[in-house]
Design a protein with these regions (language model features):
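Short coil/turn connectors at secondary-structure junctions
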Residues: 1, 22-25, 37, 59-61, ...
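N-terminal basic/disordered segments at the start of proteins
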Residues: 1-31
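General beta-strand structural signal in soluble alpha/beta enzymes
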Residues: 4-6, 27-30, 63-66, 116-121, ...
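Conserved mixed alpha/beta catalytic, RNA-binding, or beta-rich assembly cores of soluble enzyme
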Residues: 11-12, 95-99, 105, 112-230
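Short glycine-/acidic-enriched loop or helix-start segments at secondary-structure transitions
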Residues: 13-15, 74-76, 249
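A short acidic, amphipathic alpha-helical/loop segment
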Residues: 14-18, 64, 228, 251-252
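Feature captures the catalytic cores and cofactor-binding loops of soluble hydro-lyases/lyases
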Residues: 31-36, 43-53, 60, 78-86, ...
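N-terminal glycine-rich phosphate/adenylate-binding segment common to multiple enzyme folds
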Residues: 51-122
């Protein structure tokens, strides 16, 4: 039996749908803000004892964490004894960044003899690996890719930031911070419209951070991101192999084929 701890977003819904289609034995614990009456187990992240109890009751040996989970509300009356025990560590992790908080969740589950695994262990088709492009990648694109890769790798060695960047003809247009990729694209739209007024150029590059645990925090792109990049007249999106989930693949690939655009996978 596999436990799925589901937060907000489209990824948990997709995982549950695929698990149902493949008839994998699983139990879903809903941590989403949007509660579903059909779901049996609905909790807050602060109810860790109850969550573990359900996972043990269903004999879950492996657990998948997916979706965005709201940071703990320390005025929430639904605290339980186990979460209070870990409260000093939680506060310390929150100061360091979300990645450290996720590490703590893994540690708690490990102590309960449950292994956290990536959803791609059972759903490898979610990886953005096998994309066929019509558009040829230019020498300038390759230079932008190299610059973006070096930039992000150097930046996220020291800081819990820098999952993506926009590079246009050697110029760093934007670096993602806490706002997320789509908001970064939105904030960069004005300058990109000026840069790409007469031609199409530039790339969005996304790489996982060095401290990112890809079992529980795989970077994700989908149709919305692809469409926004095309609307901003970028040449393409660059992703790392076996490190990104690609949602809405069929819909996105159909859009890519209709436009002069590429998705490149790098090592």
């Amino acid at each position: 039996m596999i436990g799925i701890i589901a937060g907000d977003g489209s990824l948990p819904k997709l995982i549950v749908k695929r698990f149902n289609n493949k008839k994998f034995n699983h139990v879903v614990i809903n941590l989403s803000k949007k509660k579903n009456k059909k779901q049996k187990y609905v909790f807050a992240i602060t109810q860790i004892s109850s969550i573990i109890q359900i996972l043990k009751k269903n004999k879950c040996k492996e657990v998948i964490l997916a979706g965005k989970v709201t940071r703990p509300n320390f005025t929430d009356f639904r605290f339980d004894k186990k979460i209070i025990k870990f409260l000093p560590k939680i506060l310390d992790a929150l100061k360091k960044g979300d990645s450290y908080l996720l590490d703590l969740v893994i540690d708690i589950l490990k102590k309960e003899k449950m292994k956290v695994v990536s959803c791609t262990k059972y759903l490898p088709e979610l990886f953005a690996n096998n994309i066929k492009n019509k558009k040829l990648i230019s020498s300038q694109d390759l230079k932008d890719i190299k610059k973006g890769k070096n930039l992000l790798e150097n930046l996220n060695q020291k800081f819990d930031v820098g999952q993506s960047a926009i590079i246009n003809n050697g110029f760093v247009v934007a670096i993602e911070a806490a706002e997320g990729t789509d908001q970064m694209l939105l904030k960069s739209s004005k300058i990109l419209k000026k840069l790409n007024k007469n031609n199409q150029s530039g790339i969005l590059i996304k790489l996982p951070k060095k401290i990112q645990d890809l079992r529980i925090d795989l970077p994700t792109i989908g149709f919305k991101t692809v469409k926004k990049c095309i609307d901003l007249r970028l040449n393409g999106i660059v992703l790392k192999k076996n490190a990104h989930i690609f949602l809405d693949q069929e819909k996105s690939i159909a859009l890519i084929k209709k436009n002069n655009f590429f998705i490149k996978i790098i090592n």
